[in-house]
Amino acid sequence: MKIKPKKNIFFVERKPHWLSSRQGYFTMERNERVDEFPKSFMSSLKKDLKSFDLRTYPDTHLIYEEVSRWLKIKNNQLIIHEGADGGLLRVFEVFISGGDRVITCNPSFAMYPVYCKMFGAIHCPINLKVKNYNYFSELKKKIIKTKPKLVAIANPNQPIEVMLNIKQIEEICKLSQRFGSLVIIDEAYYHFNKITAQPLITKLKNLIVVRTFSKAFGVAGMRIGYTISNSKIIGLMLSIKPIYEINAFNMKLVRHLIKNIKIMKNYVKEIHKGR
């Protein structure tokens, strides 16, 4: 008997990475950090890595305490995962079933349509235009028309940059609540613009904020991200997490990044100067 995968998988096409070797190359469209980390930072990180870290399973509750303290939220409003896409995948795993409608922008983060196909969701993209485009108005119309299960918004979006302000995000969430829709605000580039939906997570019960350490912090190779939301949504996402959602090295790396937050802030300043 021939073994077949789930039907949805037949609709998923993934292109292989074009680089046969990464040595000496940067993928600029993914906004990888091109500047070296300070030698003092690298030296301190290396000294902090012990043989014990390699031999034992990670004690993850410590990093939850540190990251939640840094973000000024409660432990039960946070889940850590592999990159921003790890958070998006958890949301799809918990909330999205076959036939559910999902609104995203197009073009935007490449994994949105992939996850829609994986879970049999109906992808309802908003096709962005470069000039004279009322993105906020079109988004509201799309929500009313499609009555989606999920609205996933990269804020700011890229490669075509559109962005919602806090009042607009709140309005989108309240509109979506009328249809029982979740709203993901993907804040991968939040540190470059300082507009964040984080203050709204306790007020709006359908809001999920996803972030990554890959962009402003510049550690894309380590695949670290996190999601913040109300405790109910986070509790559901935690119920399907792996046994250990972050490894021992990455926990120490995150601690050093937070401790040396000026490295990130200075990098962001340099990026702004170059624009």
Predicted regions and their residues:
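PLP-dependent aminotransferase-like
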Residues: V94-I153
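N-terminal small-domain helix-loop-helix segment of the aminotransferase-like
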Residues: K2-G83, R90
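Short glycine-rich anion-binding loops that position phosphate/pyrophosphate groups of nucleotides
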Residues: N31-V34, A84-D85, F109, N155-I160, ...
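Active-site pre-lysine segment of PLP-dependent enzymes
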Residues: K131-T146, P159-V219
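Hydrophobic residues in well-ordered beta-strands that form the structural core
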Residues: T104, P125, I185, V209-R211, ...
